[in-house]
Design a protein with these regions (language model features):
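Basic/aromatic-rich interaction segments and small domains that mediate binding to polyanionic partners
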Residues: 3-65
Length: 65
């Protein structure tokens, strides 16, 4: 379980064949939702702002040590 303001790695396609699709992006937890889902903000200046905020499943997140 992740906490609000915790930094994580977000991987949209963790089981993809391509390394580029499996590569994670740094994100911060904004909110904890029901059904093991989280609202995150992706720290990627190359992404348009409208795509940086997402609701994702916990299995797409990994903690940053």
């Amino acid at each position: 379980m992740y906490r609000i303001d915790q930094w994580v790695t977000y991987c949209q396609f963790p089981d993809a064949q391509s390394e580029n699709l499996r590569k994670g992006k740094r994100a911060v937890i904004l909110d904890r939702l029901s059904n093991n889902r989280y609202e995150i903000y992706i720290d990627d200046p190359e992404m348009d702002d409208k795509w940086r905020r997402k609701i994702v499943n916990a299995e797409n997140l990994k903690p940053i040590d």
